[in-house]
């Protein structure tokens, strides 16, 4: 099996048409739905550690033909992903999981630090999303 980064979504469609055994998974949580629309088969979603139901619903809603609902689910993780600007995405995810009551430990150095501003932003986003019923 071969893994590669594809930045051009049209390439997904072109490649799929050339080789029916070539499957595309989105490695970026914010691109799961766009990849599915171009013929991708799913995603590897780090944010699913925090919002498993939301992330799995993107795929399920797409498969059910409920594109507007899938778009809403895809868009709903944007506020969480915005916290990534404060540190390594894996650090933010692990901190979020810990703040939700699951002590999974820190990332290894040098990716084990999230500044106070990032922790505050994360706490705010987690609360806002919990108030919306996201999980």
Which residues make up each language-model segment?
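Short, small-residue-biased leader/transition segments that mark boundaries at the very start
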Residues: 1-6
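Short beta->alpha connector loops
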Residues: 7, 29-30
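Active-site-adjacent beta->alpha loops and helix N-cap segments on the catalytic face
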Residues: 7-14
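Short beta-strand/loop segments at the ligand-binding rim of alpha/beta enzyme cores
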Residues: 15-25
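Structured C-terminal cap/extension of enzyme domains
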Residues: 18, 30-135
């Amino acid at each position: 099996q071969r893994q590669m980064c594809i930045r051009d979504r049209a390439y997904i469609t072109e490649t799929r048409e050339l080789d029916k055994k070539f499957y595309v998974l989105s490695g970026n949580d914010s691109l799961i739905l766009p990849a599915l629309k171009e013929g991708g088969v799913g995603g590897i979603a780090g944010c699913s550690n925090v919002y498993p139901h939301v992330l799995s619903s993107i795929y399920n809603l797409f498969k059910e033909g409920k594109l507007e609902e899938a778009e809403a689910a895809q868009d709903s993780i944007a506020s969480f992903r915005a916290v990534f600007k404060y540190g390594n995405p894996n650090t933010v995810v692990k901190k979020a999981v810990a703040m939700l009551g699951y002590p999974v430990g820190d990332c290894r150095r040098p990716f084990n630090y999230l500044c106070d501003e990032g922790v505050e932003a994360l706490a705010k986003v987690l609360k806002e999303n919990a108030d919306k019923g996201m999980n």
